[in-house]
Amino acid sequence: LTYQKSLYKEPAEWSENPDVAPVDRMFRTPDLYGYFTMQYTPTKKFSMSLTGTYSGPMLVQHMESSVTPVDIAVETPSFFDANFKIAKDFSIFPMVNLQLNGGVMNLFNSFQKDFDTGADRDSGYIYGPMMPRSIYFGVKLSL
């Protein structure tokens, strides 16, 4: 877990609109963020893992679009993105191993709730986890 503060020495202009106030915080840099990884291997051929990423609130630019009439600096919500994987190994020949695995990415389905829409949307107004909750299965063959 990391706590840091990214500030400009002097408030910075970020919009071409002179009515938009400058900001002293750097955009897209949360003050608090971190990750964790846990792995459990009860037997040599079976494993489970749990990973996660936390991103605290941050300031992002939301430029003039179909949703907002002027450029604004938006404070995002925090996000927690967790992933789970389970794997089982099988020896199919003396030097060949087959692994079957599966899991869930973005376990809690964390995502941005306020996307812009329409032809005049701000395509740069994207933050938070990129993938929705996803279930996957895999096969790995190793020598």
Residue ranges: model-predicted function:
Residues 1-63:
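Gram-negative outer-membrane beta-barrel transporters
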Residues 15-25, 68-74, 122-127:
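Extracellular loop and loop/strand-boundary signature of outer-membrane beta-barrel proteins
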Residues 24-27, 77, 105-106:
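Flexible, active-site-adjacent loop/turn segments at secondary-structure boundaries
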Residues 29, 41-43, 75-77, 91-93, ...:
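Surface-exposed coil/turn segments at beta-strand junctions on protein surfaces, enriched
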Residues 30-34, 78-82, 96, 131-135:
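Residues that define the transmembrane beta-barrel architecture of outer-membrane proteins
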Residues 34-36, 48-50, 84, 98-102, ...:
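Transmembrane beta-strands of outer-membrane beta-barrel proteins
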Residues 54-63, 88-143:
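C-terminal beta-signal and adjacent terminal beta-strands/loops
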Residues 65-71, 80-89:
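Short, local alpha-helical segments
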